């Protein structure tokens, strides 16, 4: 029940921070993540809350993708194939092959979500080439932590219980959000 409260200081910090060109997009990503956190609190009442939470996080990741693409273009970079795409695709394939037999009617939504979050990681990976250190490290570790958080959640929910799943999900998720914000705010 604390997870939505823990994201509010981060949203506030971005809101009051010095303006930067894509601040609204970052705020939108955080607010949709916050809405996803709230919706997931009610999963025990009805499965629709899981779907709505998934949609909220999907929207947040789309905002992160847009943010990263805009930042790549701002750096006069180009979106091109890099080796990281292969690693991300392998991870995505293995995870989905493990989960799909256990997803039931959620196969399509989970595949869509997994592709979108993998795209977010790939855009973060590309953007990291145009960012100085340590900003690029925050960006990459934040995006990877988001994937880890969602992977633990999915594995725990659909495949096999993970010991201390709640703790692992919260730690990786909160670090992910903090690191992504840290990579954007100067």
Predicted regions and their residues:
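Polytopic alpha-helical membrane-helix bundles and their juxtamembrane interface segments
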Residues: 1-186
